[in-house]
Amino acid sequence: MELPRLENVDLSGKRVFLRVDFNVPVENGKVTDKTRIEKTLPTIELLIKKGARIIIASHLGRPKGQVNPEFSLAPVVETFQSLVKSKVYFSKTVIGEDAIKLSKELKNGEILVIENVRFHKEEEENDPGFSKKLAALADIYVNDAFGAAHRAHSSTEGIARLLPAYAGLLMHKEILELSALLHKPARPFVAIIGGSKVSTKIKVLTNLFDKVNHLLIGGGMAYTFLKSRAIPIGNSLVEKEFEVQAFQLIEKAGVAGIDLQLPVDHIIGDQFNEKAKTKSVDKMGILDGWMGMDIGSKTVSNYEKIIKNAGTIFWNGPMGVFEMDKFASGTMAIAKAVAKSKAKTVVGGGDSIAAINKARVADKITHISTGGGASLEFMEGRKLPGVEALKKKTSE
């Protein structure tokens, strides 16, 4: 997939509208995880070096089209300022005369961050008038927000049709790494899919089916698969309406010669909190009144053997309720096994990234994808509006 590149474009003195994904966790007015900000710094540094005047736009949370101080980018700007050498200004408005004036006053290499684009309901409606007002802030558009590329919004799609548009360095890297997984993975290709719901992962499981050699399933979604095979799951999370599809996937894997593995033992709890009593149970199933909260040691051992011999690994979704220390050991063990593997490793999804960081092995992973929903949709084989809008520019 060829996307228009920034590297050879003369940007000196040009106002560049840079869409980034600064949708980071903020607690008590402080950013608690800078990963997404840091990932886009190479693009920002390239623009500074080229003498561009940079207008940065992002969303934060879901303010539902209204100005809400809780979702202001102000604390994010504070963190961002400490990561770049250039002068950084903050516009309390997104569009209009004040924002345009600030954008025109920028000197080469300086940065203006505009307020949360989702403070305007027109952003998520991809309203043409709003896209035009965003385009008035700049001469050139660059999209480096892979994490929002699956949304057809004004700042990710609409504006790209109004200005010369390019992909940022992070956007390129994401597309390159994820495309390689789908088209030419080193074998054996192992996909580790976890998380709480089958409903959110069924499409990616289906698309990966004819590409992987091993499919390792964990997290809350595993219990829908186990229930479909009449294994007792007690009070564990289950999506009844997906039992048939789960059963069909197991059958299909058998026919296709894909090694689909489910947990053979579990760490269970009598309630969904840190105070829960815990037990370890094996394949006989989970007792009534108890719920599966993590994969057990036999499952970890089974999965580790497969991970050790992999050529390529894609991991999306934790193996259990890893936010609670009592139920984190399965996810932590898998994180460490993936990090230790000699395979090319790609990890996507907020929870999996948090697990990798918690296990302190982020530096051992080949590629950490910043796009949760976007990387899943890409792995489902779907077209991403934010990427398609950039491609259109090259063919026009």
From Swiss-Prot:
InterPro entries: Phosphoglycerate_kinase, Phosphoglycerate_kinase_CS, Phosphoglycerate_kinase_N, Phosphoglycerate_kinase_sf. Monomer. Its EC number is 2.7.2.3. One of its GO terms (cellular component) is cytosol. The keyword Cytoplasm applies. One of its GO terms (biological process) is glycolytic process. The gene is pgk. This is Phosphoglycerate kinase. GO terms for molecular function: ADP binding; ATP binding; phosphoglycerate kinase activity. Belongs to the phosphoglycerate kinase family. Gene3D superfamilies: Phosphoglycerate kinase, N-terminal domain (3.40.50.1260). It catalyses: (2R)-3-phosphoglycerate + ATP = (2R)-3-phospho-glyceroyl phosphate + ADP. Keywords: ATP-binding, Cytoplasm, Glycolysis, Kinase, Nucleotide-binding, Transferase. The lineage of its organism: Bacteria, Pseudomonadati, Spirochaetota, Spirochaetia, Leptospirales. PROSITE patterns: PGLYCERATE_KINASE. Pathway: Carbohydrate degradation; glycolysis; pyruvate from D-glyceraldehyde 3-phosphate: step 2/5. It is an enzyme of class 2 (transferase). It comes from the Bacteria. The keyword DNA-binding does not apply. It is found in: Cytoplasm. SUPFAM superfamilies: Phosphoglycerate kinase. Substrate binds at residues 21-23, 36, 59-62, 118, 151.
